[in-house]
UniProtKB/Swiss-Prot annotation:
Its EC number is 1.1.1.79, 1.1.1.81. Catalyzes the NADPH-dependent reduction of glyoxylate and hydroxypyruvate into glycolate and glycerate, respectively. This is Glyoxylate/hydroxypyruvate reductase A. Its main location: cytoplasm. GO terms for cellular component: cytoplasm. Gene3D superfamilies: NAD(P)-binding Rossmann-like Domain. Belongs to the D-isomer specific 2-hydroxyacid dehydrogenase family. GhrA subfamily. The active site is at R227, H275. It is found in: Cytoplasm. PANTHER family: 2-HACID_DH_C DOMAIN-CONTAINING PROTEIN (PTHR43333), D-ISOMER SPECIFIC 2-HYDROXYACID DEHYDROGENASE NAD-BINDING DOMAIN-CONTAINING PROTEIN (PTHR43333:SF1). The keyword tRNA processing does not apply. It comes from the Bacteria. GO terms for molecular function: glyoxylate reductase (NADPH) activity; hydroxypyruvate reductase (NADH) activity; hydroxypyruvate reductase (NADPH) activity; NAD binding.
Amino acid sequence: MEIIFYHPTFNAAWWVNALEKALPHARVREWKVGDNNPADYALVWQPPVEMLAGRRLKAVFALGAGVDAILSKLNAHPEMLDASIPLFRLEDTGMGLQMQEYAVSQVLHWFRRFDDYQALKNQALWKPLPEYTREEFSVGIMGAGVLGAKVAESLQAWGFPLRCWSRSRKSWPGVESYVGREELRAFLNQTRVLINLLPNTAQTVGIINSELLDQLPDGAYVLNLARGVHVQEADLLAALDSGKLKGAMLDVFSQEPLPQESPLWRHPRVAMTPHIAAVTRPAEAIDYISRTITQLEKGEPVTGQVDRARGY
């Protein structure tokens, strides 16, 4: 079994060594320009077109949970990968726990009004504030995939009312499920904290705009953990300035790194992190990839395959 690996920043030697330990019968090599030798599987992130074009691969693994970048390249270069070759994304591989940590910590930060207390500290004001109740602090999750399910599971322990919005109906215990555009308004109307975990598709680009934000309760919060292109940044800032939104926490942006001239840097009710909410953890990724390749070789059912038409 031949496996090729390409990632512009990862330590290729470590990955090659770890994969060969996990798959003793495999020969793994870092792909370099000019390497046209046969391969059965490819592990990639932002691969050059020539790496995959013309290869008779059994499968390709994208080294991340999001596949919008590679799908965009495939759409621009259909010759890059035959439509019959399955494409897999990393399923969880430690990202679920990271998303749980991030989402729970931020929801609790807002629920306990730590942002308000920080603002009072900056004014040297000692002023206890009225508490929020859990009943009025409903959390709505847009996107009900693997990571959305993990976030909902972690928030349940804290007793917040939970709801999710997705393409298909979910039957998660303790979570109200809303489906499609026809149920979006009902989902938003009672959502105090909106958590975005949607995939990046043509249908979801720009979805968090003034029309959507206007349907949230006054004083709502937005937590974006998915993709920057989901948010119309000017609309978000307008909602913050008007008081419609009380705060926003952003991990992703339409342009990364975020330009220094962006007003998001200076807005007092915007907090941000540099796209670190959930990063690929190599050991967990190796475990998932080696397990999935073994299942594929045995003809067993697998999970994590990308539906190219849907975009996730």
